[in-house]
Amino acid sequence: SLSATDKARVKALWDKIEGKSAELGAEALGRMLVSFPQTKIYFSEWGQDLGPQTPQVRNHGAVIMAAVGKAVKSIDNLVGGLSQLSELHAFKLRVDPANFKILAHNIILVISMYFPGDFTPEVHLSVDKFLACLALALSEKYR
């Protein structure tokens, strides 16, 4: 679970990255699709070019990071705050919840690239814990 310190670190970092969140989301999603090609199955209607600069990846990256922003605002109740998104991914999109952890890995990587001075080991730990809790909350409707 997230401590008060973890929550404060995540909120402080989000304040810094929110303005670039769409760009970070596109980079994270694009990296995931290249590095973990099995995830492309969920985006087959987008064609073969799924790099970070393609319009579809840029748009969905922005959607993903908007959801992360919503999660930051709902940090004290992630399951409730992400309930509709969990339902969408479980019942309509049928996304394997293991992919949430893969995306979280790529989000962490991209944050560290864009904000190296802010991404201390302590912040890394808090963000990792937060994204693990977010992935768990998104998996709630799968049970």
From Swiss-Prot:
Domain Globin: 1-143
Keyword Metal-binding: yes
Chain positions recorded as heme b binding sites: H89
Record-linked Gene3D superfamilies: Globins
Keyword Acyltransferase: no
Purpose: Involved in oxygen transport from gills to the various peripheral tissues.
Oligomer and partners: Heterotetramer of two alpha chains and two beta chains.
UniProt name for this protein: Hemoglobin subunit alpha
Taxonomic path: Eukaryota, Metazoa, Chordata, Craniata, Vertebrata
